[in-house]
A protein has these predicted regions:
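Transition-metal
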Residues: 1-147, 211-240, 270
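His/acidic/aromatic-lined binding-pocket segments of jelly-roll/cupin-type domains
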Residues: 93, 102, 119, 125-128, ...
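Ligand-binding loop in jelly-roll beta-barrel domains
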Residues: 97-101, 132-135, 185-204, 301-303, ...
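Short, basic/aromatic beta-hairpin or loop at an interaction surface
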Residues: 148-161, 281-289
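Loop-centered beta-sheet repeat module
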Residues: 156-207
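Short acidic-glycine-tyrosine-enriched beta hairpin
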Residues: 168-180, 297-316
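C-terminal amphipathic alpha-helical segment
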Residues: 206-278, 282
């Protein structure tokens, strides 16, 4: 079984999805001939909703990462993390390439998940835009104005897709932008947007706009029925406060660029590392996604498209080379 004392390069891990995409993931990984899907779950200890194994990452020796962490959580995650979360990475990282617009949907909060789904984690997420295609790459975030429960129920019952999408705030995005998506916030990612996504480690989604995307409505409400599932939706208007969710970081040339504001700290952390020479990284469980260039993490070779899981037990590591990478980490611990 893989030990938690050195970084491990991971292959692609692509559980089947209902929507199109994947060309940008294939291009990043340098394997454009492969039949890539729209999502690549990196260092995943999370399964697809309702599935036993689909979605789990496998280490090079054939061990599931989930099992390796469970066997030695302190080595993989660190003593302080284990004291708070046990043998739970508390993080899921994805590469997501939207080859079509995704449906309007949202995710439950910790409180809703605990009450209705018997799970500690809901699904707050953040998007790091790393590439776009097309003339108007757009994401849709939160209702423009307050929407009553009755109006939303009517849209969902009638599958009034046009009105649901029109009710959201459209935001043009470019590489370097980040978007924080709190649990409950209705949203959709537009065609041509390629992101590194950090999220809580669940696959809980309430699909408001299921027609044309899912086989039937039953798949969209987490087995709760829409009457209960819609209780997780944020009905508030966000037009006046949308800027609190968005950061534009493309022009920041610092060696380490924090990508999220403090509101993300209880859920995850991410930095863009822009290395020309060497950079020392403190000990932490982390997921590294290399966007450009090449180099080494310790003695582990890296190139564009490399995805790496770094155990806390690897200790302080030096990143050498000429490269740009996203470093993803679990929630910031208090104290």
């Amino acid at each position: 079984m893989s030990s938690g004392d050195r970084p491990v390069v991971l292959p692609a891990n692509q559980p089947k999805q209902f929507y199109r995409g994947g060309a940008s993931i294939a291009a990043l990984r340098g394997d454009e001939s492969a039949d890539f899907g729209p999502e690549d779950w990196v260092a995943s200890t999370t399964t697809l909703y309702g599935r036993d194994d689909a979605g789990l990452s496998t280490l090079p020796d054939g061990t599931l990462l989930r099992d390796a962490v469970a066997a030695d959580p302190t080595a993989w995650l660190g003593e302080r993390h284990v004291a708070e979360f046990g043998a739970d990475t508390a993080l899921l990282v994805k590469l997501l390439d939207a080859g079509q617009r995704l449906p309007v949907h949202c995710h439950p909060s910790n409180e809703f998940a605990s009450t209705h789904l018997n799970c500690r984690h809901g699904k707050t997420e953040s998007w790091i835009v790393v590439g776009t295609s097309g003339d108007e790459p757009t994401v849709y975030i939160g209702f423009r104005e307050d929407v009553s429960p009755e109006l939303l129920e009517g849209w969902v019952a009638a599958q009034d897709n046009d009105d649901m999408l029109a009710a959201l705030n459209p935001v043009r995005v470019a590489a370097g932008d980040t978007v924080f998506v709190p649990a409950g916030l209705p949203h959709a990612i537009g065609e041509g947007v390629f992101i590194v996504e950090l999220q809580q480690p669940t696959d809980f989604s309430v699909t408001l706009e299921w027609k044309g995307f899912l086989a039937n409505a039953d798949i969209g409400h987490l087995g709760l029925g829409y009457d209960a599932a819609l209780g997780c939706v944020d009905h508030n208007g966000w037009a006046k406060t949308l800027d609190t969710l968005i950061r534009r970081t493309a022009g920041d040339t610092a060696e380490v660029v924090p990508l999220f504001s403090e509101q993300a700290d209880p859920f995850f952390q991410a930095d863009r590392l822009q290395v020309s020479g060497s950079l020392t990284l403190e000990a932490s469980f982390a997921v590294l996604v290399v966007l450009e260039g090449e180099g080494k993490l310790g003695d582990v070779p890296l190139r564009k498209g490399s995805t790496v899981v770094v155990p806390h037990g690897a200790g302080e590591e030096v990143l050498n080379g000429e490269l740009v990478a996203i470093r993803c980490r679990p929630p910031r611990l208090a104290g």
